[in-house]
Amino acid sequence: MANPDFKSPHEIWPQLYQLEKELEFWISSGAFSDRELAARFHERIETIHPFTNGNGRFGRILTGQICKRRRFEMPTWGRALKSEPGKRRQTYIAALTRARRSGDYDALILVLFS
């Protein structure tokens, strides 16, 4: 059974196009801080979920590339919890889910930049 948090296969290309346009707007308008823009982009690309496997890695690469090109602070992906990999993953997934479902990006920003 499909995960209702992720997009259906037929929605992937339109959603990627929409995300590209939103990213352009977020950057040009200064709608969000650098950290929040990175978190919002990361949540959206993970929700679009374009691949069967490897979405997390793909999302981290794209988010990092956007930060690098825009000269934003680079995400550290929860490095503060590196000694506890299980907790690090659980914290990341909980923060991603919270952002996806409630629009509250604070926890995800904390994970991305701690």
Indicate residue ranges for each PLM-predicted region:
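FIC/Doc superfamily catalytic core
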Residues: M1-S114
